[in-house]
Amino acid sequence: MAKFLKAGKVAVVVRGRYAGKKVVIVKPHDEGSKSHPFGHALVAGIERYPSKVTKKHGAKKVAKRTKIKPFIKVVNYNHLLPTRYTLDVEAFKSVVSTETFEQPSQREEAKKVVKKAFEERHQAGKNQWFFSKLRF
């Protein structure tokens, strides 16, 4: 079978706490691992999407409304719905790894790096579809 779930592919989580949230695959594990003996992927996604901003909003309001709350997680392939979109993950690829999930402090640091990368891309106006809430 062709490996189409590559790093950088955007997907939608269809099961669990983050169902309906958009994620980007950081590291795919097709064969599984000792701790997760099934095909899975390390993903970084958006838990809370940025709100809409208009011209009449002040600088404080704009700053507050453009905040993004990210999450990082190990997700089974069965719970991912891949899309045609891709996103550059080079900014945080080195930070999010299997070792990141061992200690909460490492996890928080990784989330901060992911948040910074996502907010920079959102401010630049790139990947607009990824930063909009999925309506269903």
From Swiss-Prot:
One of its GO terms (molecular function) is structural constituent of ribosome. The keyword Cytoplasm applies. Pfam families: Ribosomal_L27e (PF01777). One of its GO terms (biological process) is cytoplasmic translation. InterPro entries: Ribosomal_eL27 (IPR001141), Ribosomal_eL27_CS (IPR018262), Ribosomal_eL27_KOW (IPR041991), Ribosomal_eL27_sf (IPR038655), Translation_prot_SH3-like_sf (IPR008991). Keywords: Cytoplasm, Ribonucleoprotein, Ribosomal protein. The keyword Ligase does not apply. Gene3D superfamilies: 2.30.30.770. GO terms for cellular component: cytosol; cytosolic large ribosomal subunit; preribosome, large subunit precursor. It comes from the Eukaryota. It is found in: Cytoplasm. Its main location: cytoplasm. Component of the large ribosomal subunit (LSU). Mature yeast ribosomes consist of a small (40S) and a large (60S) subunit. The 40S small subunit contains 1 molecule of ribosomal RNA (18S rRNA) and 33 different proteins (encoded by 57 genes). The large 60S subunit contains 3 rRNA molecules (25S, 5.8S and 5S rRNA) and 46 different proteins (encoded by 81 genes). Belongs to the eukaryotic ribosomal protein eL27 family. Present with 22900 molecules/cell in log phase SD medium. Component of the ribosome, a large ribonucleoprotein complex responsible for the synthesis of proteins in the cell. The small ribosomal subunit (SSU) binds messenger RNAs (mRNAs) and translates the encoded message by selecting cognate aminoacyl-transfer RNA (tRNA) molecules. The large subunit (LSU) contains the ribosomal catalytic site termed the peptidyl transferase center (PTC), which catalyzes the formation of peptide bonds, thereby polymerizing the amino acids delivered by tRNAs into a polypeptide chain. PANTHER family: 60S RIBOSOMAL PROTEIN L27. This is Large ribosomal subunit protein eL27B. It comes from Saccharomyces cerevisiae (strain ATCC 204508 / S288c).
